[in-house]
Amino acid sequence: MPREIKDIKDFLLKARRKDAKSVKIKKNPENVKFKVRCSRFLYTLVITDKEKAEKLKQSLPPGLQVKEVK
């Protein structure tokens, strides 16, 4: 089941959870989507600012598997 998250801090808390498996980063010309797969839900965060997206990518937990999709 998908869920959309509006807050960056809330997304980082979800990404640091024990059941978070992987993060997919989808880049479009107008926005960047971060999708974190947890055991029950797929949480999605949409960011329109490219600089914020790069900072968020750097602050993801190191043990999490990150896949970039063009």
UniProtKB/Swiss-Prot annotation:
Which Pfam family is an annotated match for this chain, by its short name?
Answer: Ribosomal_L38e
- Going by the entry's taxonomy, the superkingdom of the source organism is recorded as Eukaryota
GO molecular function terms listed in the Swiss-Prot or TrEMBL record: structural constituent of ribosome
Q: Which GO terms describe its cellular component?
A: cytosolic large ribosomal subunit
Q: Which keywords, in A-to-Z order, does the entry hold?
A: Ribonucleoprotein, Ribosomal protein
Instruction: Supply the InterPro entries for this chain.
Output: Ribosomal_eL38 (IPR002675), Ribosomal_eL38_sf (IPR038464)
Q: What is this protein called?
A: Large ribosomal subunit protein eL38
Name of the coding gene: RpL38
